[in-house]
Curated annotation (Swiss-Prot):
Expected to play a crucial role in calcium-dependent regulation of ciliary movement. This is 23 kDa calcium-binding protein. Ca(2+) 4 binds at D174, D176, N178, T180, E185. GO terms for biological process: regulation of cytosolic calcium ion concentration. It comes from the Eukaryota. It comes from Tetrahymena thermophila. Ca(2+) 2 binds at D73, D75, N77, E84. The modification Blocked amino end (Met) is found at M1. SMART domains: EFh.
Length: 207
């Protein structure tokens, strides 16, 4: 089965840090986890944005929401998608003097999931890109050692994988048994781990 692969932009560390805050805010107010914000959810996002800037007890008006929707809802469907939101945040960061030049493009599955899950996957995608040394879009066994080592490191553990560890990891991740792990297989493996850990994952179709 063919899976569509797309690319995702990675920015300078300071810019990515701000985007991480924005992603968490989007995930917080995407209450039904459908990957979009409706006007009522946008009102909560605006209020929290003001609070984060030190403006307490700000009363969000209908005009505030309309103005925000006009600026962000590019396709005018009455909803703010995550991609529209991120483009708006990047434009604001650029105006504020942040470096918004794309530093790297990482491959990812075209599947769309809720923003909280996407934040987890963003970390995994960058890890995949880092150890895909020949940029083939596939991880070979020799590249998997680094992935496993850094995964443990992110959990605060200094662990060096053995050959048996790598072969076990490959057996769980390489679902088509072609000897390499694609970004789609890797994302599916990460999603499976998140679900086992009790993390709610929602996939949806969005144009």
């Amino acid at each position: 089965m063919e899976h569509q692969i797309i690319t995702q932009n990675v920015y300078a560390p300071d810019t990515e840090a701000k985007l991480d805050v924005a992603r968490k805010l989007f995930a917080q107010f995407d209450s039904n986890k459908n990957g979009t914000l409706d006007p009522s959810e946008v009102a909560g996002l605006i209020k929290t944005t003001f609070e984060n800037m030190g403006v307490k007890d700000y009363s969000v008006t209908a005009d505030d929401v309309k103005l925000y929707m006009k600026s962000v809802d590019v396709d005018n469907n009455g909803l703010v998608s995550y991609s529209e939101y991120e483009e708006y945040v990047i434009a604001c960061l650029k105006k504020a003097g942040f470096d918004c030049e794309v530093k790297q493009k990482v491959k990812r599955s075209a599947k769309k999931r809720d923003a909280a899950t996407e934040m987890k996957l963003d970390v995994a995608r960058r890890l995949f890109a880092k150890y895909d040394s020949d940029k083939s879009g596939q991880l070979e066994e020799k590249e998997v050692y680094g992935v496993i080592t850094e995964t443990y490191k992110q959990m605060g553990m200094d662990y060096k994988p053995t050959e048996a560890d790598v072969k076990l990891w490959m057996s769980m991740t390489d679902t088509d048994k072609n000897g390499t792990v694609s970004i789609v297989e890797y994302e599916d493996f990460v999603i499976s781990g998140l679900k086992k850990a009790g993390f709610m994952v929602k996939e949806f179709t969005q144009a």
